[in-house]
Amino acid sequence: VDSLARALGASDLLADTGAAVRRFPMAITPYYASLIRRFDESDPIFAMAVPHGGEVVDPPFLSDDPLEEEHDSPVPNLVHRYRDRALLLVPSTCAMYCRHCTRKRVAGQQESAITDAELAVAVGYLRDHPEIHDVILSGGDPLTLPTERLEQILQAVRAVETIDVIRIGSRTPVTMPMRITHRLVTMLRRYSPIWINTHFNHPVELTPESMEACGRIVDAGMPLGNQSVLLHGVNDDAQVLEKLFRGLVRNRVRPYYLFQCDLVRGVERFRTPLSKGIEIMEYLRGRVSGIAIPTFVVDAPGGGGKIPLLPNYIVSMSPTHTVLRNFEGRMVSYPEPMERHDSTPAAAPHAGVATVFELCRGTATTLGPDDHGGCTAHGGGARRAACEVSDTTPGSPGAVSRRREPSRWSGYGTEDWSGLRPARRVSRPRALRGGAGGV
């Protein structure tokens, strides 16, 4: 903190940040610090990078791990929440520690990276779960690893035949663009298909250096997306985000997600009402090309996963017509087909999981919160000791309750892990490492 204050020529800059720094580490690259123009919270770069006394003030509904990633971690360094994808946390460090990070509990708390033994365990889990086709490397920031070490990790993951796509979540193109070298992207290209999601939050970050880094990634054949976070006082302004998204698309970066700030300790000052994000989405629709509009999502607390939030454009529905509202507020009537073809639901769920599909089919009359979600043999399998599924068919005397045990795993290559069985929490040699990244 003192070094930053001296570098910026603002010795009295951080009078109230001591407690915040003691709780959450601080790091900022000289490049990113050079983007600061005002030494207070009104500057977006300052707000995202410099500790603030508000980081030690927490309402009771905030937590260290609001997404319950550790509950969905069957082996160290790996999070398996969604059936077909997994998150692999490879380093615990970043070039710059964002003050709004969802993994503040671990990011930068210890400078470490996944070991060979831990990587072998994670890869073993991927091999034993062929339903996983998509692996996201996150952390920390994977692109802060030495190129040789990153290649070893990519090589190990790519060796799993059922993995179709590898994704990398990285803020390095934003905070340390000089790291995106020809040598790095040439190495990454060898493990194609690789998709990269970066993390621009404000137009000020769209510098010639960062755009050159993004261009180098795209020119190497890797699709590049962006995951922004809606931050009070930084980008909770429709015109600011319009400028950001237009600038990204102009430089071949596709806005992918706009995240509601997570319910993590230390970030209350950044949180906005959900209505603010919906308001911004309403503003963008019709003003900005569809390829420049991300999906606004809230990552549900308790490990509920991402929930998209959109303005409601349906005014009313009847068997013959649906009344819709367009981006101008004009209402139109859309005629439904003369013959209905919706007697069969569009898709069946995974076997043994009660969902809305059962209600549509008529094989169940009710669906409660304990009847689905996190109880299957894939993502969330360790979330409950057992799951109750209510199965009521028309004409039956009542609901038949059946108990399903969660999936079991054992070992995956190390003696310390061989005796473990599923539980709500999986004890492990050291804390799950973290950083910013989305699934």
What is the predicted function of each stretch?
Residues 1-80:
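Flexible, acidic/Gly-rich N-terminal and inter-domain linker regions that tether
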Residues 1-29, 319-439:
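Radical SAM enzyme core and accessory elements
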Residues 25-28, 72-103:
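N-terminal pre-triad scaffold of radical SAM enzymes
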Residues 101-113:
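Iron-sulfur (Fe-S) cluster-binding segments and ferredoxin-like electron-carrier domains
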Residues 111, 115-118, 129:
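Intrinsically disordered, low-complexity linker/loop segments enriched in Gly/Pro
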Residues 120-134, 143-288:
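Conserved AdoMet/S-adenosylmethionine-binding subsite of the radical SAM
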Residues 150-157, 310-318:
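Short, electropositive alpha-helical surface patch
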Residues 276-317:
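A C-terminal junction/extension of Radical SAM enzymes
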